[in-house]
Regions:
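Catalytic cores of nucleotide-sugar-dependent glycosyltransferases that transfer UDP/GDP/TDP-activated
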Residues: 1-154
Length: 154
């Protein structure tokens, strides 16, 4: 597991000190990241490093991985491609399955003690609908949104 000190020599002592200084503003905060896979993707690789580094500088960070059926992940792959410009035809049934998977995930994934939620990519995006607490939510999109299929924004 990486620690910030492992980067000493790659980045300057001033940068490491600056990261600690900036993180001190969040020392009493709980942050949770949500994405759709624990392995095999760029977001997962990033979170494997980022979450321990956040904890190392004193930010209480966690990570939740969305659970869904093969059909759900097939639909979210269409979302992914559509957000990058491919034309997508999502039936009402596919939209319902997408929403239902997020609702189901929300029922056993308790985030009420977190001060901020960071959603990575579109798979868990509608999950905010199913929580009563309205702490800050951040959508960190890791895909190109230059020319998305306009129908996906509906």
């Amino acid at each position: 597991m990486k620690r910030l000190e492992d980067y000493r020599g790659i980045v300057s002592d001033e940068i490491i000190a600056d990261l600690h200084r900036r993180a001190s503003k969040l020392h009493d905060k709980h942050v949770v990241h949500m994405n759709s896979t624990a392995q095999g993707g760029g977001v997962a690789e990033m979170l494997y490093a980022l979450v321990p580094l956040m904890n190392d500088v004193g930010v209480d960070a966690g990570w939740r991985v969305l659970v869904g059926s093969d059909d759900f992940f097939g639909i979210t792959k269409k979302f992914h491609n559509g957000l990058q410009g491919d034309p997508v035809n999502l039936t009402d049934n596919k939209k319902r399955l997408y929403i239902q998977a997020n609702e189901s995930f929300s029922q056993y994934n308790h985030i009420s003690k977190h001060d901020a939620v960071i959603i990575h990519d579109p798979q868990p995006l509608p999950i905010i609908r199913f929580y009563k607490k309205r702490q800050p939510w951040i959508w960190r999109c890791h895909i190109d949104l230059t020319a998305p299929d306009p129908g996906l924004w509906e």
